[in-house]
Amino acid sequence: MSNESQVSEAPVNFGANLGYVLDLYDIYLDNPSAVPEDLQVLFSTIKNGEANIATNTEGQSNVTKGDSTIKRVMRLIDNIRQYGHLLADIYPVNRPQRENVPKLNMEDFNLDQETLESISAGIVSEHFKDIYDNAYEAIVRMEKRYKGPIAFEYTHINNNRERVWLKRRIETPYKATLNDNQKIELFKNLAHVEGFEKYLHKNFVGAKRFSIEGVDTLVPMLQQTLRIASDEGIQNIQIGMAHRGRLNVLTHVLEKPYEMMISEFMHIDPMKFLPEDGSLQLTSGWTGDVKYHLGGVKTTQSYGSEQRISLANNPSHLEIVAPVVLGKTRANQDTTDKPGAVTTEFKKSMPILIHGDAAYPGQGINFEAMNLGNLEGYSTGGSLHIITNNRIGFTTEPEDGRSTTYSSDVAKGYDVPIMHVNADNVEATIEAIEIAMAFRKEFNKDVVIDLVGYRRYGHNEMDEPSITNPLQYYEIRKHESVDILYGKQLVNENIISENQMNQIFDDVQNTLRAAHDKIDKNDKMDNPDMQKPDSLAEPIQTKDEEVSYEQLKEINDAMLSYPSDFNVLKKLNKVLEKRREPFESEDGLVDWAQAEQLAFATITQNGRPIRLTGQDSERGTFSHRHAVLHDPDTGAQYVPLHNVPDQKATFEVRNSPLSEAAVVGFEYGYNIQNKSCMTIWEAQYGDFSNMAQMIFDNFLFSSRAKWGERSGLTLFLPHSFEGQGPEHSSARLERFLQLAGENNSTIVNLSSSSNYFHLLRAQAANLGTQSMRPLVVMSPKSLLRNKTVADPISKFTSGKFEPILPEAHDKASVKKVILASGKMFIDLKEYLTKNPNKSILLVAVERLYPFPADEIDALLSELPNLEHVAWVQEEPKNQGAWSFVYPYLKELTTDKYDLSYHGRIQRSAPAEGDGEIHKLVQNMIIEQSTNIN
């Protein structure tokens, strides 16, 4: 057996990074003259088989007396790279005690200075041989680097090119990029960051502000990020963060004036101090929100070329804003105002996500959001993650809050580099940003920086942390703030004098005091306007521009025309060819899927882009949509909606990962950034949508009232009771109706394909306007192919969306009106078709919110012999629409007609688990509700 085969089969197991020397050794085995002469000598000492390099179960290198010197050196080098972070100087206070740290010293490997001085520095890294005289100097440098104020973790990364890039960037001697003037400017920025907090602490005692103190360097890190982004031509920055440090970021990154911030603490209208040049955009709703949830948008040239910096509005639900920011970023990167497919340019925008050390590993939304990072439909070219690590979560310390060494460890599964940096080492934090931004630019991947600091006060400024964390806070209270530490450093470096340092501190306080003095203390907000805007006074406008028969036929023909070299699966082709029938026969009907396709096509013809995502949305959960066709012979894909005649905007459909919260958050963010785009999320089954309940509750339905943030996101939630059990029946309609108020949404449960067509077009027409709002569709399952739902093409070329659809009736004969929606209406219609009764008028309530009370009232008033009104639903009485519609129906029927409910009784689970029992219950509901007596 040759040396080469022995080495290639050896159990070399140093983690992901084996070190540059092992690569050279492989080259040496193949061609000794291809490596430097000094290494040829060293490699020649390795006997056959001795290159079997392994590690023990603790991850520490096995060292035996018989090991060659070169192998021991390589083990030492590899251990420093892989485990040096465990001994790094990254803790400003309360350094944790490490146990079972792998061997990281020369002595552990039977090495000494003299031995290492006799070895070339090239054994450590190729470029070291031109920098250092020998391996000893190189290893000393490595130890300082890997055990310094930045701790590096990258050996877990699978991609060799990324590992090599990081290794060389880290190990190349760092040349300071900060000159004296830049250091002074950095110090002044820190003085403002810390001085702002101290001023608020002194003048607004006990007021909640969630101070940044302890991780103050976050602000200069962000400022440096913006400078680098500007140099790279990135003009749009999207930032997401929670409440900790938010006021400081608003003030010193987005340049919100001190007067505005102080006004908010005084409960005085801050908008009086909004810059008149329009550079700062702050929106608010009619109910408002606490100051540390609010965001803003700043257009500035402070960091180089003109940039638009956005800080996303955020609820108290930690980390949930992350996918929203990713969606906003992707919307900025996508070009959608052209026909066909979307094009994405990462350089247009970048996301910065600021996390908390307790929340980052604690909240599952981070796993979901990071999983989006390299997916074609969701990637943003790499997020910069900064963990503001104050090493405590409210009162919970790390050992009770996570099962890992670092709060950042969850990111390792996503193959991204991690840097831990001492928040008190100002210049190290700047270097960490520079490395992160360079890596992102090179590889378009996420990077995580763990900014390790502390929290100066309790969770909020009214909290006393010594009650639960006395030892930690004993040390923190003795610890000087970073602005003082850095100021003293500059004094010691003779860059500034002590008097200059103190003068800068005084200047900051004087600036804040002057801003405070501008505010009239008596100018209180006594009568705040909490009325919703006039644009929400009415339901969404549903007037539809008519579409000609010729236009729809041209679209339909185009959808059924394929490239000459593309084959459609024969079985599927038969299904699709049936879509010609509505245009070829009077008996032809347009089903749900075809109605949707025609609506989408006309919407893009009108210049509205469409983005549809969800699990299995390309085909459709129920194999109905077929928006992406697959050639059975070649696997090639074809999207018919990229072939729409006279198309003016893009169509995009994506299968999403198996996630609800992050994907819905992403689509919400996409929509609020590109308000003209018809952004749609489709649940695989509506039952699973409650995995995204936080997005519905805290963003979609309340964002406009809280923050003035308009959304027109559309939800498709398959919903109907069909004997498939309690987890495949209900989209929890009742929860969406509970969230409905102040005309904040449109919620429908439809029974007509043409009404669906008109609704989608109406929703699209309102996008980008002040009247836009979310649309929630309880979409069908079995009804997708039900001919009762399908309509002739004539209903598509005229009309508009109708909130109620009464069946044909003789007004004088009607004694009972049955109101129902969705599949319940269709079941009743099919029953009454077989068992006609002129005394009963069946009415489809297509729009549940805003409830069509006026339309129903007008209908009832036309029925002279009406005695009874019944609401019929599939869902249990405590679920579905009944609790919501009852007050409206009670008001309409009081002193006029009897009112009754028909449906399942109150249940804790939505539906029966047995299909036969389901049929019995469903039939009972139908028979009881249609009994005229």
Swiss-Prot record:
- Which Pfam families does UniProt cross-reference here? E1_dh, OxoGdeHyase_C, Transket_pyr
Q: Which reaction does it catalyse?
A: N(6)-[(R)-lipoyl]-L-lysyl-[protein] + 2-oxoglutarate + H(+) = N(6)-[(R)-S(8)-succinyldihydrolipoyl]-L-lysyl-[protein] + CO2
InterPro entries per the UniProt record, alphabetical: 2oxoglutarate_DH_E1, 2oxoglutarate_DH_E1_bac, DH_E1, KGD_C_sf, ODO-1/KGD_C, THDP-binding, Transketolase-like_Pyr-bd
Gene Ontology MF terms in the entry: oxoglutarate dehydrogenase (succinyl-transferring) activity; thiamine pyrophosphate binding
Q: Which SUPFAM superfamilies match?
A: Thiamin diphosphate-binding fold (THDP-binding)
GO biological process terms, alphabetically, are: glycolytic process; tricarboxylic acid cycle
Q: Keywords assigned by UniProt?
A: Glycolysis, Oxidoreductase, Thiamine pyrophosphate
CDD domains (alphabetical)? TPP_E1_OGDC_like
What cofactors does this protein use?
thiamine diphosphate
Assembly information from the UniProt record: Homodimer. Part of the 2-oxoglutarate dehydrogenase (OGDH) complex composed of E1 (2-oxoglutarate dehydrogenase), E2 (dihydrolipoamide succinyltransferase) and E3 (dihydrolipoamide dehydrogenase); the complex contains multiple copies of the three enzymatic components (E1, E2 and E3).
What family classification does the UniProt entry report for this protein?
A: Belongs to the alpha-ketoglutarate dehydrogenase family.
User: Any idea what job this protein has?
Assistant: E1 component of the 2-oxoglutarate dehydrogenase (OGDH) complex which catalyzes the decarboxylation of 2-oxoglutarate, the first step in the conversion of 2-oxoglutarate to succinyl-CoA and CO(2).
Q: Which HAMAP family match?
A: SucA_OdhA
Q: What protein name applies here?
A: 2-oxoglutarate dehydrogenase E1 component
Please tell me the species this chain comes from.
Staphylococcus saprophyticus subsp. saprophyticus (strain ATCC 15305 / DSM 20229 / NCIMB 8711 / NCTC 7292 / S-41)
